[in-house]
């Protein structure tokens, strides 16, 4: 049986130095997650060792390709993949319990249109995905790093957005969502100033929640407490 700590020791989560947008928590996979991981990683898992992939070869077809960065426990990604079998989905998550949970969902639902990386999204972008291969990139509820001294750790930064841009086809969508108002304002400021992107909202500002973005249990809980959620949808113009 695969040992999760050994997996990330022999295949480091990131090759990048400097500020990280994530902290590796010490949580361990449950027995069910470990078993799902061991049964399914060979089929659904991707790694840096695969190098620059050809999505058409990975999925055996040339369909709409989505990338979700930081899928958490994976239920929303599984919901989207199940609801859109004609689309393909690549998920990225550094926390192995989430990877195990997603693989359990993928197996139980019989999904064939999902593949998974368990490394830093920066490495996936730089080392694994060819330019202009993605139709949509989704970053839902990333860590807001709410203390001002930690804002530099926020994933959505001008340099990161430009690297995402090159992986999107022209017309492709970058969809961001957060339940932290200050981060929403930061995202809108970054995206509005980003070369090669335009807001899908003609008047600028935030977007209504698209029907195909699942509502998470945390989002439902937040809504019941009166918390807001902000969606931003920008498309690549050039």
Swiss-Prot record:
S-adenosyl-L-methionine binds at residues 68, 93, 120, 143. Its EC number is 2.1.1.33. GO terms for cellular component: tRNA methyltransferase complex. Keywords: Methyltransferase, S-adenosyl-L-methionine, Transferase, tRNA processing. It is an enzyme of class 2 (transferase). Belongs to the class I-like SAM-binding methyltransferase superfamily. TrmB family. This is tRNA (guanine-N(7)-)-methyltransferase. It comes from Marinobacter nauticus (strain ATCC 700491 / DSM 11845 / VT8) (Marinobacter aquaeolei). The gene is trmB.
